[in-house]
């Protein structure tokens, strides 16, 4: 007789993904400038550590908030007791106003429609429980965040059907890709309950444009399904074009009095924009009262501590601080992004043009020994074990094209990033002859075929020639 549940013993958590395996290898041999200078540098973790000094400065200037005081009087006992799981009103108001500020105050949010969760991971899973039954499917554009295989599927039993996007158009979402994914789900006898997108994208570091957002809204309207817009990177946009929230497009296109209004749900957190993943601050925003009610009840399994809510309600209510923080943080992200792009370019490596996020989508297709995912994994292993950099292979993000990698840049010092760039440049230079020989061999084979072809091509009809190509 089995003593453990099927959920406890199943292998569907996704922990065997190369995304998580890279973390494990880093933890075995972490880089340290003094203690372990040849260790693995963590470039597979999307953390924003660039503006901690701004947060620390605010805390030093506001000892009451950090010391759980109000007007000099301790409120420790008040915060230590059970709180309403709807969340502290002061924090929810501060959170919705901060969300508006991140979006340039072009849209406003009602705190009554906000559900607090212990991070965006909890928010996304809670929405799955609210919107899908076991075996139902959500469509996700590829490449997507590897953790979604765990967050959306493991405990809920929901399925993910990929919307295959291509580098030919910068991995943009197209109508044909949406329809193909929908039909694929139907062929697999899966009931499609919605589409989930990250905007800005993880791992691409790009923002969805208005055309894509309008396309998504039209699609979910026609199919009668939901849209989840994960906007946890909305405050990390450091270059044009600017960030456009799906809420803006809903209002611009007058969806307020349609069924679509209640079928669009936003996920947000302070992990990326404010660099506080350890504080576990996430949120669901929905115009559907039933979703808000159900998600609020479920949030009792992953509450945000009252102490954290009080501290951050004070911080986010300081508009002078939030304005300075948003601006300065974006400047620092822009500088660090440019440093990574320049370093990779000096090594002969290009990136997808991006304007947001804490990472770049890096093109290493020319370094593959062959054009397949086995070669991608071989290259990834060399970069992790030989070069000493933990980066995320595109296959872990369900990219359909081998040779792409996500590389993070905001979770380390400039000196560490500079060292990482020197390591990758040395690696490319040491392997360049092999890569060149591989390319030359391919070209030689192609030329040989062309010469052979020319000897008897006159015998073929035009149609035969077309088929040969």
UniProtKB/Swiss-Prot annotation:
GO molecular function list: 1-aminocyclopropane-1-carboxylate synthase activity; pyridoxal phosphate binding; transaminase activity
EC assignment: 4.4.1.14
Database matches in Gene3D superfamilies: Aspartate Aminotransferase, domain 1, Type I PLP-dependent aspartate aminotransferase-like (Major domain)
Chain intervals with Low complexity compositional bias: 437-447
Residues modified as N6-(pyridoxal phosphate)lysine: 272
Catalytic activities: S-adenosyl-L-methionine = 1-aminocyclopropane-1-carboxylate + S-methyl-5'-thioadenosine + H(+)
SUPFAM superfamilies on file: PLP-dependent transferases
Pfam families: Aminotran_1_2
Function: Catalyzes the formation of 1-aminocyclopropane-1-carboxylate, a direct precursor of ethylene in higher plants.
PANTHER family in UniProt: 1-AMINOCYCLOPROPANE-1-CARBOXYLATE SYNTHASE 3, BIFUNCTIONAL ASPARTATE AMINOTRANSFERASE AND GLUTAMATE/ASPARTATE-PREPHENATE AMINOTRANSFERASE-RELATED
Name of the protein: 1-aminocyclopropane-1-carboxylate synthase 3
Species name: Solanum lycopersicum (Tomato)
Gene that produces this protein: ACS3
């Amino acid at each position: 007789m089995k003593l453990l549940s099927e959920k406890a013993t199943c292998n569907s958590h996704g922990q065997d993904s190369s995304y998580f395996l890279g973390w494990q290898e880093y933890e075995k041999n972490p880089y340290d400038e003094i203690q372990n200078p040849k260790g693995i540098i963590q470039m597979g973790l999307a953390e924003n550590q660039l503006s901690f000094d701004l947060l620390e400065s605010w805390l030093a200037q506001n000892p009451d908030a950090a010391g759980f005081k109000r007007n000099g009087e301790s409120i420790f006992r008040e915060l230590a007791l059970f709180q309403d799981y709807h969340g502290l009103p002061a924090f929810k108001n501060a959170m919705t106003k901060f969300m508006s500020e991140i979006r340039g105050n072009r849209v406003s949010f009602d705190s009554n429609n906000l559900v607090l969760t212990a991070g965006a991971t909890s928010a996304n899973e809670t929405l799955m429980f609210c919107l899908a039954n076991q075996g139902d499917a959500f469509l996700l554009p590829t490449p997507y965040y590897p953790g979604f295989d765990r967050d959306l599927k493991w405990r809920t039993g929901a399925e993910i059907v990929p919307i295959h996007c291509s580098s030919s158009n910068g991995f943009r979402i197209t109508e044909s890709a949406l329809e193909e994914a929908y039909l694929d789900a139907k062929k697999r006898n899966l009931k499609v309950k919605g589409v989930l997108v990250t905007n800005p994208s993880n791992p691409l570091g790009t923002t969805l444009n208005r055309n894509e957002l309008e396309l998504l809204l039209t699609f979910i309207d026609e199919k009668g399904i939901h849209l989840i817009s994960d906007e946890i990177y909305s405050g990390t946009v450091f270059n044009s074009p600017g960030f456009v929230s799906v809420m803006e497009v809903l209002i611009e296109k007058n969806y307020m009095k349609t069924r679509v209004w209640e079928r669009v749900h936003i996920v947000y957190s302070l992990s990326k924009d404010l660099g506080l993943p350890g504080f576990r601050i996430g949120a669901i925003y929905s115009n559907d009262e039933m979703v808000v009610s159900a998600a609020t009840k479920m949030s009792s399994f992953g509450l945000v501590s009252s102490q954290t809510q009080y501290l951050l309600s004070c911080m986010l209510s300081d508009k002078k601080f939030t304005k300075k923080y948003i601006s300065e943080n974006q400047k620092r992200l822009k500088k660090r992004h440019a440093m990574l792009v320049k370093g990779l370019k000096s090594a002969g490596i290009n990136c997808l043009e991006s304007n947001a996020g804490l990472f770049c989508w890096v093109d290493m297709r020319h370094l593959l020994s062959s054009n397949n995912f086995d070669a991608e994994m071989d290259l990834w292993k060399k970069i992790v074990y030989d070069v000493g950099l933990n980066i995320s292979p595109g296959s872990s993000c369900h990219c359909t094209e081998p040779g792409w990698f996500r590389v993070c840049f905001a979770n380390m010092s400039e000196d560490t990033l500079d060292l990482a760039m020197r390591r990758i440049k040395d690696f490319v230079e040491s392997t360049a002859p092999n890569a060149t020989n591989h390319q030359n061999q391919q070209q030689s084979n192609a030329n040989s075929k062309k010469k052979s072809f020319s000897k008897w091509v006159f015998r073929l009809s035009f149609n035969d020639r077309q088929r040969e190509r």
